[in-house]
Amino acid sequence: MKLSIGNDHAGPDYKKAIVDYLLSQGHEPINHGTDTADSVDYPDFVHPVAKDVSNGTAAFGIIICGSGNGAAMSANKHPNVRAALCWVKEIAVLARAHNNANIISIPARYTSAPQAVAMVRAFISTPFEGGRHQRRVAKISDCCTAQF
């Protein structure tokens, strides 16, 4: 499976750990992140990931910044993207199962690299439950066409 990954200066070590895990499982990571701790702007690395997910180039996206908030906000500006800020594995599972999230946003300053790998593993292996959640997820996109 192809997965797109991007990170700012807070996440190079996290990205390396995640990419190593993905490769060990036979996945194809698409790297849009920085490899240094030199200060950069997270949207420059998040938008390419969101585009990959939005247009179907990647099945899932992984974005990493200090708090995870700015990355998630940037990604969620793209059509068909549902980026979820996750800080523990259980939240990653619920983001997939109940919200059909397709991008996981990881807060590097509030998690560890091993936790991030565990969250990614849980995120990409959890199916969307559909059912009552499908109706709710559909309403997320409805705002893009609705007149309020």
Predicted feature descriptions by range:
Residues 48-85:
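Helix-adjacent hinge/juxtasegments
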Residues 5-24:
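Glycine-rich phosphate/diphosphate-binding loop of Rossmann-like nucleotide-binding domains
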Residues 4-6, 10, 89-148:
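C-terminal binding/interaction regions
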Residues 28-39:
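A short beta-strand-loop structural module common to alpha/beta enzyme folds
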Residues 15, 46, 71-72, 116, ...:
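A general structural signal for well-ordered alpha-helical segments in protein cores
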Residues 38-47:
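Structural motif
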